[in-house]
């Protein structure tokens, strides 16, 4: 059978940054109880977006925070 698509290319991924310990607080929230079956959680990150300076913004839905991650990998809370 003819396949016009190239074979998938394996790309090796590596960790660029992870949430600093000072922002981790494993606990129950109004969000985590129904969404994570009453398990305590540290965060639930989603909604990545970049600005023109290369900062990455992500939303912590569980704790109602927005983080900014600089191109150097430094984390700040922008909204809480």
Protein language model regions, located:
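Sequence-structural signature of mature extracellular/luminal beta-sheet repeat domains
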Residues: 1-80
